[in-house]
Each structure stands twice: as structure tokens, then as C-alpha cells.
Amino acid sequence: MPAGICGCCGALRPRYKRLVDNIFPEDPRDGLVKADMEKLTFYAVSAPEKLDRIGAYLAERLSRDVMRHRYGNVFIAMEALDQLLMACHSQSIKPFVESFLHMVAKLLESGEPKLQIYGTNSFVKFANIEEDTPSYHRRYDFFVSRFSAMCHSCHDDPEVRKEIRIAGIRGIQGVVRKTVNDELRATIWEPQHMDKIVPSLLFNMQKIEDTDSRTGPPASPTTGDKEENPGILAENCFRELLGRATYGNMNNAVKPVFAHLDHHKLWESNEFAVSCFKIIMYSIQAQYSHHVIQQILVHLDLHKKDSPRIRAGIVQVLLEAVAIAAKGSIGPTVLEVFNTLLKHLTLSVDFELGDRRSSAGSAVFSSSSTRESDERIVQNAIIQTIGFFGSNLPDYQRSEIMMFIMGKVPVFGSSPHMLDTSQLGDMGTKRIQIMLLRSLLMVTSGYKAKTIAAALPPAFLDPLLSPSLMEDCELRQLVLEILHNLIDRHDNRAKLRGIRIIPDVADLKIKREKISKQDVNFMKKHGQQLYRHIYLGCKEDDNVHKNYELLYTTLALVTIELANEEVVIDLIRVAIALQDIAITNEDNLQMFNRCGIMGMVAAYLNFLSQMIAVPAFCQHVSKVIETRNMDATYFLPEVIFRDKCSLPKSLDKHEKNQIFLTNKIAESLGGSGYNVEKLSMPYVPQVTDEDRLSRRKSIVDTISIQVDILSGSNTEDKVNTEEITFESLKKAIDNTGMEEQEKEKRRLVIEKFQKAPFEEIAAQCESKANLLHDKLAQILELTIRPPPSPSGTLTMTAGHAQYQSVPVYEMKFPDLCVY
């Protein structure tokens, strides 16, 4: 029978069509006919093979009603489809689903907001249905595109616009839930889909950042907020998406975030960028954190030539990311993070110096100075990131990072891994040194090693105490502060703050333990390095109050943490040597520096005498301090480091009772069982190869002079010069007298080698050997030059003046010289 005849006669139409037609009332406002809907549902459940036909017929009616704007019938058809979906769970539902999705697509394509919202709601209901066997051929490309477009709705009515955006976000959430649960269906993670989904969510999240900036772990908004606020709904959808991402999909989920922030220029005012990456870091699985950090580092490399504020924004995001990642797993990216940050630190310094050089030749300074300050922002952000990341690492990794950063500091004789600053010049090298030491200071903060040898291995200590890091006041301060972080294992530094004469050290409640055997061995091997650094640091003429305070704290911390009886004697020798520097003034220091050294020595010896609790020593120190209080207050730290302190014109007229005397100290300590033989030998710092090649002012000359004038005399023992007479000359010529003098010299040499410590003997021999080598080098340089021409003429070769040698037979000698 022809189909047309069946269409005219209702009784001859298929039963499923009659059942579908019966659910539509004459007046659409009456809604779905429930009795007939129950019949249709029973029929669909009883004959599931008819589901595909039912769905196709409903889709046909819905398409016709949409075209004719019969929206009442459209809503009835969608309600019927929803009920059939919820009631039927069989293999035959798959063809029916295709019809259902086709009808949802029709609604989403319409320009009517109500239909779009209704279609989205139906799709969300479908997404919440768990299918027994998922259909792998089904794709959701259209729905991803359409829901993403709805998230960017620009409808004129604000309320309608808000409803459409909420519907779009809920639709994306439905697509995500429907697809990401199945590991075999990974189409949703493809870049073409993520490039639509993620920016759509970020676009709506951005709308609430101005009024509500959420940080930390995922929030728990109320159900009402989720439904009414597109921003909160988008954020929860974003968290859910990231929480379902695997390692292979992480890159596709994070890359669109970078693209969105770049496109909308959100790095400079980076509150939203920071918020986004906090959400990312808290939402993803902990073992994937290092992958996100890698992506941020790659993005930072891509923007290395952009404006400073953009780079600073990216670094700030990195700081927030590593702050979260450092608490969990950070994978193999630890050194990569630091290496990349140090590279960008060098670039920033290079840009800053380049702008400074370019502005020096022009008359306009405003733009260049602004860029300089922006580069400082980048540098500070990098340092904060390095420090925060390093300080949150476990101790075993932190020690590696300390070595890694120290290896990058440009110093003499450092490792080949140090940063190349040859293109930056002296100023750039100094800036890099300061930046790296500031980073190192933050990394070492709170680090507690069991032994000082573990905290200060030779590979770390040698470059840290290098004279290359003593050329600037700020550099020396940073080095001392790093030493404080590593030496102070009992948190005593805060109690020592402020250089002063402490009346009773017991009131400070210093925490102290018995020095371990490992620490004793460390001081035997490296104690001379520490003493030398303190000694030379006091002699710098650009020292300020902070330098002396840090030097005092260093001496005090060494006393607390590392001092046994032998170290105490060495520290006293260093203190007396510093006092001699101020009194003799061989380095031509300013009066403030000389008085500052005297005040620092007074504060330290007062502290030391009370720490070792030798009554006679304490009495001598107290007596000197009382005398200074009466007659020489400028030798006390509380006075000399006070603002507008009046300085003396000279120190030539100082009294003997105003200074600390070696013989008095030796007597007091000797009576308490200390071995004071070393106190008779003045302290002399070691000379290193770097000193000889250093560009700094005469470290070698200063030390060499002290080596040459070594004698048993101290500040209080003045040797009278011998009066030269005819008789004394006769005795000098007499052979017997010469033999006695030789015997005396040999006796003194033997005594010195018997009593003096090995380090001092080695320092003296090394300094003299270095001087001898320098003299020999000068002599050899003179001897290998060709003899000058008798006429004194010069010849120019390749722009260089050269003397031409004349054969002997051509030389003209004076007549008196010719035989």
C-alpha cells in the first residue's frame, strides 16, 4: 500500500507514529499528555527495536515545529525525548541517541535564546546518563563549538546574556563529563577542542577577578552561586577539566591558557594570571606539577625579549607555581628551573646596562630610567622565585642548589659552569654577583646542617670567600650574611643583633653545644680562611656600620658554634691584629674606619671574655672599656656608630691603658690552662694565587710587609732603635760578633718553627716565595729583550715600536774602551 494513503488514514499509520502524535495536545499550552506519554514509554521499553524510528519521527516533527516557530510543541517533543532517554537502557538506544543529538543541535542552531537554553539542558541530562557500552564513533565537535560560542554571548539584554553564558558553560561541562571518563575516547583533548573550551572558561572566569580574587585550594561555593554566577561555574568546570587530565593531555590543556593571557595582555597586571595558575596547580594531580612548571619556563624563554613587565609577570606566576609544587613532587626540573632563571637574570642585567649605556649618549632619560626600574622588578622577581623555591626544598636538594648557584657566581678560578659575564663588563659582573648572592642568601635561610663541613664544603667555601667578592661593600655584606645562615645552627643571630658592649652575656641565653670532632677538623682545615676573610674585610675603606656589625656577628657565631681552646686563641690573635691595623694605620684608613675597628674589637673581646668565663681576662677587658668610657668614647661601638659622632683628629696620643694588651691577655689565659704560646706570634693572613692576580689594591703588598717585619714585638712593646757609633761598627765587622748573630738567628728560626702553627709558617714561606718569583719574572723579562740600538732609533712594525739589534762589529765604542 502506498505511503501516501497510510498518511491520510490514521488507522493505517504505524503504531509508534500514532503514539507519538497522541502526546501532543491540541493546545501546546496544556503541556505533554502524560497518559499517552506513559503508553509511548511502555511501547518503547517493550519494543526497543522501534526506538530509532520513534526518535527519527520525533526529530522530524521537532524540525518542522522549529521552522514554523511552534515553540510549545518543540518543548513537548524535547520533554518526551528526555523521558525516553531516562527510561530506556538497551543496545538499541544508540540510534535513538543520534536522533536526540540531532534535535539538540537544531535547538542550539536557532537564534532563540530559550531554545538554546532548553537544548543545553537536555544535553546536560543526556551527559549525566551512564551508557553501558560507549559509542566510539560519536563525536561532539559541533557541541564544543556551539557551547563555546554561547560562553561568549553578547546579547543586548544582560539577564539573557548571563543565562546563555551559563548554558554554554554547563554544556561544556556536560561534554567534558561525557567524554573524559572514557580513556579510549580522547578526542576532547585534541588541540582544536581545547583551544575553544579553555579560552571560553577563562573568558567567564576573568569577569569575576576584579571583584573576587580567589587563591589557594579549590573553593566550595554554594549551589546557588554555581547556578547564578558564570564565573564561579566556569572556574569549577575548569577545575574539573584539569582534574581529569592525564600526563599526555596536560600540554593541550595548559597551552591555551598561555595563548589567552598573551592575546588579552594579562601578564603585566598579572592578578588573573596568578589566579589561573594557582587553580591549575591545585587542580592537577601532584605528580604532574613539574610539567606545568616546564611549560611556564618554556613560555618565559619565548618572551625573553619582551618588555620587562611581561617577563616579571611570567616570573611571578612561576613563583606562585613553584611555591605549590615545592610542597609535593617537583620531578627532575629542579636544576632546570634554577638554570633558566639564572639565564634570564643575566639577560635582565644585560638589558639594564644596555639601556644605561644608550641613555648616557642621549639627552632623554625618562624612558630609559623607567625601563631600568622595570628590569629591577624582573630581577627581584627572579631572586624571590629562586629563594622561595630553594628554601622549600628538602635539605639534600637544597645543598645541591647552593652548590649550583655558587658555581654560577663569576669569581677567580671558579668552575666552568659559572655565568659568562665577559660581555657585561665590570659593572655587569658586579650586578650578577650581587643578584646571585642575594638568591643564595634566600636559599640558605633556615638551612640547618648537622656538621659545618656539610654546610660549607671546600667547593662552596672557596669561591664564597674569594677576594673577587670583596671588591664592594654590598658584596661583603651578602657573603657574611650567607655565612651567618650556615654557621648559626642554634638561632643565636637575633640575640647578637646590634654591635654593642653587652653587660652580661648570660642574659642573652645563648644556645650552645659542645663542639663536635667534625667541626674541630673543619676549623683545622679551613679556620685560616675564615680568619683571613674577617681580617681583610675589616681593612676595606668603604666599610659602613652594617659591615662592622656583620663582622662582629661572624666572630661571635664562630665563637659559639666552632670554638675550642685553640680556636679561641686564634680569634684573640685576629682581634689584636685588627687593633694593630687601626693603631698603626698602614693602610691609610679614614678615621671612622679606624675607630670602627677599635669599637668592633672591644665589643667582640667583651663577648668572648664572658663566653669563656676567665675572670682575669674579663677584668682586663672591663678595665680597658671603663678607661675608654672616661677618655676615648670614640673607641666604643655605641658611640662611634651613632649618628653625628665626633671623631678625633689623630690616634697618635692614645694611652696604653686604652688598648687591649697581648701580654695581659696571655697572663690571664695562661693561668687558666690555655696554651698561650701562639699569642706571641702576630697573626698573618695567608696569601692566595687570586691575591697575586687580583686587580684590587695591594692585598699582597700589605700582607708581604707584615711578613717581612715579623717580630716578637706587639703594640705595647716598643723596640728602641740602636744608636750607631764607631764601636758598634767595629763589632759588626768583627767575625766573632757575626758568628754570635748567626747563632741567635738560627735559634730564633728554630724556636719559630717549633712554636708557630703550620698555617702561619706556610703563609710566610708562600708570600716570600711569591715575591721571589715576581722578582725573577721581572729580571727575566728584562734579559730577554733585544739590546737597544746605539743611535736610539726605533722602527715601527705592524703599529708597534721595536728596537733593532746592531751587530757588535758595527758598534762604535769610545776610544778609551778600545784596546
Swiss-Prot record:
SUPFAM superfamilies for the chain: ARM repeat
GO BP term (any one): protein localization to plasma membrane
Disulfide bonds listed in the record: none
Mod. after translation: Palmitoylated at its N-terminus, anchoring the protein to the plasma membrane.
Main location class: membrane
Region (Disordered) location: 210-230
Top-level lineage group: Eukaryota
One GO term describing the cellular component: plasma membrane
Compartment(s) where it occurs, according to its Swiss-Prot or TrEMBL record: Cell membrane
Assigned protein family: Belongs to the EFR3 family.
Known role: Component of a complex required to localize phosphatidylinositol 4-kinase (PI4K) to the plasma membrane. The complex acts as a regulator of phosphatidylinositol 4-phosphate (PtdIns(4)P) synthesis. In the complex, efr3a probably acts as the membrane-anchoring component.
Subunit structure: Component of a phosphatidylinositol 4-kinase (PI4K) complex.
UniProt-recorded name of the protein: Protein EFR3 homolog A
Organism: Xenopus laevis
